[in-house]
């Protein structure tokens, strides 16, 4: 009798994979962590998305983050993501979802040219993308004021957002910030924790778009979205 295929031996429906994975993470998380039940749920989903239990010890949740985030999502506040990968990872949402890296391009296609963002001179490839994200954050300032910022890739996006906050130009209801990398990511997230704004973040160089999406998806589930 031929041996069962690898797919037959190991593959499971997506829902069953998620159920088993979350149960395994729940069993592995410390029982006396100090998290509320809601915060524990979002930490659990972030660990699942990362496939790394060590992430649990790096997650930082502002005391007002869950309450403020749930209120904003239930009110259908705008969600602003830094890159498309974060937006693509989100559950269905009845409010608006904007992507900063696309914001300038959308503004230039506006029906009234006088409302469009001015064109910028060409820059080197890496710098051009970083600048475009920062300009997109600035262009989406009205959406960010009272909205939910979800930054999973670009430290530049978080730094630009913090500059807006410091200048008194916007006050997000919640910032989910997990930019990843060895340059500016840890510093940007540390700057975030120094400000009195509701946030969910991951200390150090770890992070990424899947973690940011997982954190917000946990809140969307809790909000009944």
Please annotate each region the language model reported.
Residues 26-34, 48-55, 74-78, 95, ...:
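Generic secondary-structure signature for well-ordered alpha-helical cores
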Residues 82, 176-177, 215:
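Buried hydrophobic positions in well-ordered alpha/beta secondary-structure cores of metabolic enzymes
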Residues 173, 183-225:
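C-terminal functional extensions of proteins
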Residues 96-101, 169-178, 198-202:
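Short hydrophobic/aromatic-enriched beta-strand-loop microsegments
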Residues 2-80, 88-90:
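Electropositive, gly/pro-rich neighborhoods at or near active sites that engage anionic ligands
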Residues 78-88, 151-158, 180-184, 205-210:
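Gly/Ser/Thr-rich loops at beta-strand to alpha-helix junctions
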Residues 124-188:
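Long, charge-patterned amphipathic alpha-helical coiled-coil/hairpin "stalk" segments used as oligomerization
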Residues 78-137:
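Glycine-rich, small/polar surface segments that engage phosphate groups of diverse ligands
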């Amino acid at each position: 009798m031929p041996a069962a295929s690898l797919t037959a031996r190991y593959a499971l429906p997506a829902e069953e994979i998620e159920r088993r994975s979350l149960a395994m993470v729940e069993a592995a998380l410390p029982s006396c962590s100090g998290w509320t039940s809601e915060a524990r749920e979002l930490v659990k989903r972030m660990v699942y998305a990362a496939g790394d239990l060590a992430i649990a010890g790096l997650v930082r949740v502002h005391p007002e983050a869950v309450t403020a985030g749930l209120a904003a999502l239930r009110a259908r506040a705008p969600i602003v993501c830094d890159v498309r990968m974060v937006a693509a990872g989100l559950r269905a949402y009845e409010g608006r979802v904007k992507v900063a890296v696309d914001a300038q391009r959308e503004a230039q296609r506006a029906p009234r040219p006088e409302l469009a963002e001015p064109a910028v001179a060409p820059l080197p490839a890496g710098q051009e993308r970083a600048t475009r994200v920062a300009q997109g954050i600035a262009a989406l300032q009205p959406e960010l004021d009272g909205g939910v910022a979800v930054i999973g890739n670009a430290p530049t996006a978080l730094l630009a957002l913090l500059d807006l906050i410091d200048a008194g130009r916007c006050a997000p209801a919640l910032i989910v910030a997990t930019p990843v990398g060895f340059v500016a990511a840890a510093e940007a997230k540390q700057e975030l924790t120094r400000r009195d704004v509701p946030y969910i973040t991951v200390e150090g160089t770890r992070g990424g778009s899947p973690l940011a999406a997982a954190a917000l998806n946990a809140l969307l589930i809790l909000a009944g979205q």
